């Protein structure tokens, strides 16, 4: 069935990609899960635990544990909301922003090297991105309707 092959194709590239990205993250003393949350904060700051959990489709306790490590490593700051004391806003520290920029450059070099070894056109990449974004939105909606 084509739809099964379609989804399996995404799954099959995930682990090999992680194996290539891990040395970059290890060099900067950050785990992949931490990197994903740090990147999410960088793109959406200020943000909250709940917003991160929703966007990343992860449980709040998992996000909380990862955020704790990022705070302990002085990569993010937490500020209480003036309107709602229960709400806390997360932003990158200068150290976190510097790490984000450095890791982004290293990961981008890796990604460009992989793409250069293929015959994928810019249009094909953009179409794939569009399709994956559509699927991601649907999956998030489905997950939150449970």
Swiss-Prot record:
Pfam families from the UniProt entry: MarR
Keyword Membrane assigned: no
InterPro entries per UniProt: HTH_MarR-typ, MarR/SlyA-like, Tscrpt_reg_MarR-type_CS, WH-like_DNA-bd_sf, WH_DNA-bd_sf
Source superkingdom: Bacteria
Keywords: DNA-binding, Transcription, Transcription regulation
Domain spans labelled HTH marR-type: 1-137
Keyword rRNA-binding: no
A single GO molecular function term of this UniProt record: DNA binding
Gene Ontology BP term (one): response to stress
Name of the featured protein: Uncharacterized HTH-type transcriptional regulator SAV2265
Species annotation: Staphylococcus aureus (strain Mu50 / ATCC 700699)
Lineage: Bacteria, Bacillati, Bacillota, Bacilli, Bacillales
């Amino acid at each position: 069935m084509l739809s099964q092959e379609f989804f399996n194709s995404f799954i099959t590239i995930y682990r090999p990609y992680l194996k290539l990205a891990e040395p970059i993250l290890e060099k900067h003393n950050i785990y992949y899960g931490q990197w994903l949350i740090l990147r999410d904060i960088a793109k959406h700051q200020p943000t909250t635990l709940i917003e991160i959990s929703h966007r990343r489709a992860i449980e709040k306790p998992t996000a909380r544990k990862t955020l704790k490590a990022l705070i302990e490593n002085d990569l993010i700051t937490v500020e209480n909301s003036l309107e709602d004391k229960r709400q806390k806003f997360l932003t990158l520290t200068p150290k976190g922003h510097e790490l984000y920029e450095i890791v982004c450059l290293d990961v981008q070099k890796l990604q460009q090297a992989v793409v250069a070894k293929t015959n994928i056109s810019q249009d094909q990449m953009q179409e794939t991105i569009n399709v994956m974004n559509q699927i991601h939105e649907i999956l998030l909606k489905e997950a939150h309707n449970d």
